[in-house]
From Swiss-Prot:
The protein, known as: Tail virion protein G9P
Keyword Nucleotide-binding: no
Subcellular location: Virion; Host membrane
Domain of life: Viruses
Keyword DNA repair: no
Gene Ontology cellular-component terms listed: host cell membrane; membrane; virion component
Topology in membrane: Single-pass membrane protein
Length: 43
């Protein structure tokens, strides 16, 4: 998990964080696993 990926208990921060760094596969996978962030695809 990347350092800027927030803990699972911070769902609000997770959504905000992954929203801006969704391009990162590691964070995106982490978000999708917890269903905190929408599954967005980037080119």
């Amino acid at each position: 998990m990347a350092r800027w990926c927030p803990p699972a208990n911070r769902s609000a921060s997770a959504a905000a964080t992954c929203s801006s760094v969704v391009a990162n596969t590691a964070c995106m996978r982490w978000c999708k696993k917890r269903s905190q962030c929408p599954a967005r695809r980037t080119p």
